[in-house]
Each structure stands twice: as structure tokens, then as C-alpha cells.
Amino acid sequence: MLFSKEREMSDDLTKEQRHKNMQNIKSSDTKIEVLLRKALWQKGYRYRKNYKDLPGKPDIVITKYKIAIFCDGEFFHGKDWEVLKPRLEKSNNSEYWISKISRNRERDEEINKKLLFLGWTVIRFWGKDIKKNTDECIKVIEEAIFDIKMGEDKISFDEDGK
């Protein structure tokens, strides 16, 4: 059986069709980002979106508390990598996808380290967690805010010498 060089994925799309599909994948204002932002807004939290002044341009930033939030898609950010990678190794374009997703994972880790070094709290959510458990995601953010507030209180308390 002969395979066309046009077919690089394990589906029936041509190279041009695949290219068009990949171009249409959104990098900002995705459904999961909008869902989480709406939930935060309803709770009274104000934020900036796609904040360019920070490494990695976080999807949501609560500047008041120095919290950077990322809404990561499972495939492109390599959720369950130990399961996904062997599956990708069997695909037609395995080298490309393994390299791309591995680099995404490395970049995510580099961004986390840079933000932590700058004194930011980094929170990453998987898309499915946002969709299925939005309230739990909000609780995680609220717990981070509480911890930050408690840390500020301790600092000011200690500075007063009491």
C-alpha cells in the first residue's frame, strides 16, 4: 500500500487541510479560558488576560495578588505524558508531535520557574478540569489568595515587632 507524502497525520486530511486546521487552533480566549474568567468575575475577582509583561503571557493574571493562571489543553501540554508519548510513537508523524509536546512541557516548566523567581504564584489547570470542575478551580485560586493574604499579614505583624 502506498502512502502520499501529503498525509502526515493518521487521518484523511491533506497537508493543506491539516495546515488550515492547525491555524484555527486558538491560543487566547479559548472556551476554557472564558469559562474560568467568567467564574472569577462572578466571584468579584478582577484580572488581566494574556498579560504580556510576564514570562509566558499567562492566560489570566490577578495582579493584586501576583497570581499567574494558565489554562492548558491536555494534548498540546502533554497531560499524562507517560501514556500519551507511547501512543504518539505509534502515529505517522511521531517525531514531530513528540518533539513539539516535549518542548511545550519544557517551556511550561521554564515559565513556572521564571514566574516563581519573580515572586509570582503559578497555577495551571487542565482544560477538562476547568470544564468539569470550574468551582473546584475557583477554590484553588481562592486558597492561593488566602495563603498570600496570610503571608502578607505575617510580614506586617512581624515588622511591627509584636
Question: What residue ranges belong to the model's regions?
Answer:
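Nucleic-acid endo/exonuclease domains
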Residues: 1-124, 128-162
